[in-house]
């Protein structure tokens, strides 16, 4: 709670997602209400299912009816997006966080799922799709091209986005220079 309030004091005018720690719906509702009371810029982060695999739709509906902004997280499938979307009204802002990077980690292409999610939620202008667990800078380009409203990126990925626009010829030169520096550091001889 103290750490969350510290974050909120630093981010007064930015949306902040804070996740519940519970696994049971009644406890998640209690925690969600408490978290929501900490500020107007909060999105209460709720998993799409609990640890037993049960869809949290009733929880989503209850909190949404109370006008609590939600960030439904750990989403991977179009079916999950459809179920979530059916639980949300068009009065309260919500985010659906699709874990694109983790999909890629297991050899699945997240692009068709994000694309379909954007289409599914298009009729509800209060619902935004978030590209989560970004693994590489190009994910930023993919998300932007698809019309994904939000992308989360760790600092090491954000710093690489500044390289966008570099020519491939310059990239070749930079790569060869790196090879030369690495070979000198190795002190190997042929």
What is the predicted role of each segment?
Residues 1-62, 66, 95, 100-103:
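Active-site beta->alpha loop and helix N-cap motifs at the rims of alpha/beta catalytic domains
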Residues 1-9, 154, 168-177, 181-190:
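Alpha/beta catalytic barrel-like cores
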Residues 8-11, 36-39, 88, 118-121, ...:
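Structural signal for hydrophobic packing residues in well-ordered secondary-structure cores
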